[in-house]
Amino acid sequence: MLRTGDMHPDTLSRRTVAFVNIAHALDHFVLLIYPTAVIAIAAERGLDYGALIGLATGAFVAFGLFSLPMGWLSKRLGRRNLLAAFFGGCGVACLGISMTATETGFAVWLFMLGVFSAIYHPIGGAMLVTHARQLGRDLGWNGVWGNLGAASASGVTAVVAATLGWQAAFAVPGLVCLAVGAAFLALVPEDGEGNAQRKGSAGVIPVSRPMVLMGIFALAIIAGGMTFNVTTISLPKVIDERLGLALPLALTGSLATVVFVFGALMQLAMGRMVDRFSLPSIFVGISILQPMGLGLAAMTTGVPMLAGLVMAMAAIYGQVVVNDAMVARYVPAEHRATAFSVRYFLGFTTSGFAVPLIALLHGQGGFAVVLAATAAFGAAIFLCSISFLMVAQPRLNAGNVAAE
């Protein structure tokens, strides 16, 4: 086994960032297998979509709830060890889902998948900021990896489920998680100190009213958690019902993948902008696209609906980069793991209600109602961004600026 002393810090940082990026892709991939596979499961077993999708509620609640203690655990167990547990736990949970035959089994294993998936964002986010060479660029590329995981989940799951069965759609990613985890343990010996003081690392931005600013940001995170999860979870079924074409499952999943790809492109753009422009101004510009895109998707079908989803998904995933940059730029280094834990706890725990909300609203009026409600959450984010811009005035005393 390698030791930190045997490895140049640059090598350790490059390897750490590489595995953090892969973990981000796998995190979003494994959580979004079920929303596509459930279409095949429902058809095979003759069960209602609303009832089956509701079994994933525990996974998404756990995804947020168990992110909260990760900052505390990282100080005791180490970030590297927790990320290794992420790889192993997600792999075992996916294999468990592939072998279950009951609705209770689905609920239990999906819950376990949510527990281990909760490790990534607070731990991976803190590791990325620590080892990043250029914050905005590395956050942008990390976002792309996560988005590609989400994007490929729909298409890959649809193809595998249609050709090999839905069980294989869980088993194959489970084995991949275990293999990547073994490689991570072998190639990344410890946490390391990273690139915290190197070129491209920005200092913490001092503000005059930090508590008010964080309160506004918290509200935006909660609303953003709803738009993110409702949209990503329901996307394959939205396309299936509202595109206006009778498409096979594989093609439906592929179209969902195309929509996610636009989100990845926006994340690259956001990464570049974070290194060049004011974060509050970027926040306003990206957030207005969410209610616009979701509103268009709610009011239309066919190609216009697809265009609205593209706009919304680009904004939703671009917002993720902005949010992570906010934590990196407004929170001191020693508190970042805890800050990332709270950030994802707020976003993902609240959005754990996304699954029952989808089921409830879909039963009341289809996806037009689901998308309209999501657009309302998007409008709330835009209002928060305006408030954030007004409050985020730096302190006048430059001597108080802290370095990361």
Model-found features: residue ranges?
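Structural signature of the two symmetry-related core transmembrane helices
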Residues: 81-95, 281-296
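Extracytoplasmic gate region of multi-pass secondary transporters
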Residues: 34-35, 213-265
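Cytoplasmic helix-loop-helix junction between adjacent transmembrane helices
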Residues: 109-147
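Conserved MFS/SLC helix-loop-helix module at the cytosolic interface between two early adjacent transmembrane helices
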Residues: 65-101, 274
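Central cavity-lining transmembrane alpha-helices of secondary-active solute carriers
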Residues: 57-71, 257-269
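A late C-terminal transmembrane helix in Major Facilitator Superfamily
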Residues: 330, 334-365
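Helix-loop-helix hairpin linking two adjacent transmembrane segments in secondary transporters
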Residues: 142-189
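Interfacial helix-cap and linker-helix signal at transmembrane-aqueous boundaries
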Residues: 41-42, 73-74, 159-164, 239-240, ...
